[in-house]
Structure formats: C-alpha cells, structure tokens
Swiss-Prot record:
It comes from Pyrococcus furiosus (strain ATCC 43587 / DSM 3638 / JCM 8422 / Vc1). Changing H161A: Reduces enzymatic activity by 96% at 37 degrees Celsius and by 88% at 87 degrees Celsius. This is Methionine aminopeptidase. InterPro entries: Creatinase/aminopeptidase-like (IPR036005), Met_Aminopeptidase_Type2 (IPR050247), MetAP_archaeal (IPR028595), Pept_M24 (IPR000994), Pept_M24_MAP (IPR001714), Pept_M24A_MAP2 (IPR002468), Pept_M24A_MAP2_BS (IPR018349), WH-like_DNA-bd_sf (IPR036388). It catalyses: Release of N-terminal amino acids, preferentially methionine, from peptides and arylamides. Changing H173A: Reduces enzymatic activity by 96% at 37 degrees Celsius and by 88% at 87 degrees Celsius. The gene is map. GO terms for molecular function: initiator methionyl aminopeptidase activity; metal ion binding; metalloaminopeptidase activity.
Length: 295
C-alpha cells in the first residue's frame, strides 16, 4: 500500500467533487459536466478510476453520458456525482448528491449522516456488519429506506471492487473484520422508494475481464485498446465513441461481452422509481480509527 498516492488521489477526488457541485446548474448538459469532471482529474495529475457516474433522481448508479447525450439538468433534480481518481492504480472513490438549484433536504441528509455514522464506528477489529447496522439505523430513523442491494466495497491497487462489501443494512453473516491498512469505499444509498435497485438499459460502463479469441476484427482491435488503456478499471462507452462508427462499436462491445472478455454494468434504477441519494468516502483503516482520504 502506498499511503502517499492514496492520499493524493483522495485530495484530487475531493477537489473535483467540490468543483462539480458548483458546476451542476439547471440547464447544463450532463455530457458537459462529465467531460469537465474527467478533464479536471487529469489536469490535477490523476486519472479517472472509472467514468464519472452522474445519476439523476430514481437512477441510483452507473449512468455516465455518451457523446450525443442531450440530457439536461433541471431544477430540483437529485444528481448523484460519483467520482473515482487513481494515481498509479491507488484509488479514491467519493460521491455526493446535489439537488440542482436547490438546498439539501432530509433524504440527502439521511445518506450523508449514514456515511458519517459508518465512518465513526470503523477501525481495525470491527466487523463489517457493524458498519451496515450504523448505516441502516441512521437512514431508517429518518423515515427512509437503505438500498439493500447496493454496497460499499474494499479497494485494492487497480481493483475498484476487491471482493468484500459493506452493505447498507445489518446482515448477521457479514463478519469480515476490518484490518489495519484495509482501504474501503463506504457509500450509503437512501431512498423514498422500496429500497432496491434493478438493472435497466442502457449499458454505458464496462470493464475488461480477460483475453478471449474473437473473430470480429473490430472486437479484437477494441479489446487490445481496452486492455492497454484501462487495464482492470472500468471504462465508458463514451471513451470509445471516436474509435469506430456507432454500429461497429456496439457490435464489437456486444461480441466481447458475450464472449466474457468484458463485463457490462447496466444502469441501476430504484425498483419503484423512488428518488435516491448517495454519499461516499474512501477510508484507510487504522488501529483505533480511520483516515478519510477524500475529506
């Protein structure tokens, strides 16, 4: 673990997150916001650890604009801005919800306080379920529901999701014990809906899985580029749109996904179309507390 690089990635992610909050205004193209955020990451000396997620209202996660996307921010939209930065594979992951052109409300406060509650109980020796319990209690006592099938995650070098999850609810079997040096992203999601997300089209974010022989020439070209430029970190459909005509790109991605060479992350929507709020920080676990790298 390189604490210095983790801290630097966190510092960049924080700056970008705070700037994005100011940029998000009614009438702004979502595509323009995404491109501004990712450009800022590069200008500050980092690289995107994943495409910026800009998910509005009942969309909980995995929406990132595509070239030609005409989505415009409207006053009152609940916009979740989820930013990932890496330096040499050391990742910071942070998110905030803004209510476009309006003040924070109780739903947003519930997700934010759930994050604070989880951070306050986290330290070496604590079981993951205690964090889930803190998150669930904080959200439910305010009259909202945690999203049961979304969770925080362990982070390793060049690995955004490293196999251990921090759920948004108390689950008795979540007995992984936090260890000194562990890096985790904690990300409570609160909703006025049913508390569950489902996958819906489109798929705008993908990740390389493994090399697979494929017949389609464009698919072979694309897989080589994906592996070379993004490695094991997620990438956006948008980042590939200049590489080949739309029809060819869609076919190549479909071919690679079907072959198991890449994995697609469909957009996640609250099952009853309930508004969703999210807040997230990355932590490094210490003996008696944690370092929040993105604060």
């Amino acid at each position: 673990m390189d604490t210095e690089k983790l801290m630097k990635a966190g510092e960049i992610a924080k700056k970008v997150r705070e700037k994005a909050i100011k940029l998000a205004r009614p009438g702004m193209l979502l595509l323009e916001l995404a491109e501004s955020i990712e450009k800022m990451i590069m200008e500050l000396g980092g690289k995107p650890a994943f495409p910026v997620n800009l998910s509005i209202n009942e969309i909980a996660a995995h929406y990132t604009p595509y070239k030609g996307d005409t989505t415009v921010l409207k006053e009152g939209d609940y916009l979740k801005i989820d930013v990932g930065v890496h330096i040499d594979g050391f990742i910071a992951d942070t998110a905030v919800t803004v209510r476009v052109g309006m003040e924070e409300d109780e739903l947003m406060e519930a997700a934010k306080e759930a994050l604070n509650a989880a951070i306050s109980v986290a330290r070496a020796g604590v079981e993951i379920k205690e964090l889930g319990k803190a998150i669930e209690n904080e959200i439910r006592k305010r009259g909202f529901k945690p999203i049961v099938n979304l969770s925080g995650h362990k982070i390793e070098r060049y690995k955004l999701h490293a196999g251990i999850s921090i759920p948004n609810i108390y689950r008795p079997h979540d007995n992984y014990v936090l260890k000194e040096g562990d890096v985790f992203a904690i990300e409570p999601f609160a909703t006025i809906g049913a508390g569950q997300v489902i996958e819906v089209p489109p798929t705008l974010i993908y990740m390389y899985v493994r090399d697979v022989p494929v017949r389609v020439a464009q698919a072979r070209f694309l897989l080589a580029k994906i592996k070379r430029e993004y490695g094991t970190l997620p990438f956006a459909y948008r980042w590939l749109q200049n590489d080949m005509p739309e029809g060819q790109l869609k076919l190549a991605l479909k071919t690679l996904e079907k072959a198991g060479a890449i994995y697609g992350y469909p957009v996640l929507k609250e099952i009853r179309n309930g508004i969703v709020a999210q807040f997230e920080h990355t932590i490094i676990v210490e003996k008696d507390s944690v370092i929040v790298t993105t604060e």
